[in-house]
Amino acid sequence: MRTFNRRAVLGGASALALTASFAAAAPRPAAAPKLPARGNVVIRNAYVMTMDAAGDLADGDVHVRDGAIVSVGQKLAAPGASVIDGRGMIVMPGLVETHWHMWNTLLRGMSAAKPDNGYFRTSAGLGRVFEPGDMYQGTRLAAAEALHSGITFVHDWCHNIRGPEFARQDLRALKESGLRARFSYGPAQGHDLKQTIDLADLEKLKSEWAQHGNDGLITLGMAWRGHGGNQPANAVPENVWRAEYDAAQRLGLPISVHSSGSKSAVGQIGGLDKAGMIRNAQIIHAVYATPEEIAAMKAAGSTVSLAPTSELRIGFGIPPTLSFLDAGIPVGLSVDTVTLVGNADMFAIMKTIQGLENGRAENEYRITARRVVELATIEGARSMGIDNKVGSLKPGKRADLIMIDTRAANLGVFGDPAVMLVTAVQPANVDTVMVDGRILKRNGKLTAMNVAQIAREAANANLAVRKRANWW
């Protein structure tokens, strides 16, 4: 039977005090893996889903040069371009993920079905003994899975920043991967709710962002606690959440907040709205948003990130997806945490959203597969404020795209491509992934990440974390 050392695990204040020694334990950055060069490439004779007003193209071509989409059409002239054979492939925008605690991918599947090792207790108990190198290992494993799964943008909602080096190691993993990302700076597991996050370090990080932003691929935001996230509505004192909010505003950082995600958090969105603090904010979960709160979100320009697989798994409830969409609120889809849901399969998340809404409506056609694919691409990009760059295949946008091989055993026939994506496609069907014009997966294999090494080092780090916590 697993036991844990309460002194080691529950000593949150003591753990935070050990930040200096943790920093010493961070791995020395080796030479960063070299990302593939952006080139001049044309994909020919594929089924192209632009997710744009141009619609779909059978036997279509996509021409990419220097990281940008040059043209989309048929029989394109592409002088000097390398050719990728698109026959049997669906070419579509890369998947946009809008909220993921990437660090705790190191704890994959460790949330069990008993109160002593459920998700919150597991992530808090083990997160408190993380060292900076563990942040790198967890986020690097998550990034590899993202690329394997066709995800080209991630929102890394980092809520285990126990000191400056924890944030830098997490960012190091993102930068090495080549993913497009937002890194949202948050608290630590076990952080005193009466204390602000390290606002001085957040300001310092912003001032040195040129070191971390990977030439604009990665941007900075705040993982704001608001009134307390999934805790009771007033868990975080007003002076704390106001100070954090004001810092984000002063630094010009986008805000993202867990709110009204569980029955214990009912009313949080309304409370934040009364304080004038949901304007242009991303609201996560919002399972218990009321009609009045949804109207307030629309008026304030808020967006929402939904994580149906985790919301069901943990028992929060069913998100009111169509209520948000009917109100005109941009909606994105979220992995949330693989500690709880096991993997980062955005195709399964799409299937779950469609099943929940059609089941609730008792109507097979209430939300179409095409609409759900929009949530994972252009709508998700809109919810993150990056739809001017990615989310659809349109000349001038950045070249974030994926290719799905339809000739696999779980596919094999070609009907409605959107229905196929939502109901049948799996991450293993993703043949090629391109981010900003760089090919990061080709012929089913990652091109810039050594998966065997990443998995081996993550497994070793997981065992070390469990040993420090006496968590078996």
Positions of PLM-derived features:
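His/Asp/Glu-enriched, well-ordered alpha-helical/loop segment
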Residues: K274-N280, L322-A408, T423-Q426
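Active-site gating loops and adjacent loop-to-helix segments of metal-dependent hydrolytic enzymes
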Residues: L106-Q137, Q231, K263-N280, A300-T303, ...
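Alpha-helical scaffold segments that flank or form the walls of functional sites
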Residues: M110-L179, D201-N214, A458-A461
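Glycine-enriched alpha-helix->loop->beta-strand junction motifs that scaffold or abut catalytic
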Residues: Q249-G252, G276-A281, K298-S305, D326-V331
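Divalent metal-coordination and catalytic microenvironments
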Residues: A46, V62, G67, G88, ...
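Active-site microenvironment of metallo-dependent hydrolases
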Residues: R2-G60, R65-K75, E374-W472
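Metal-coordinating catalytic core of metallo-dependent amide/deamination hydrolases
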Residues: A32-P33, E165-Y288, E292
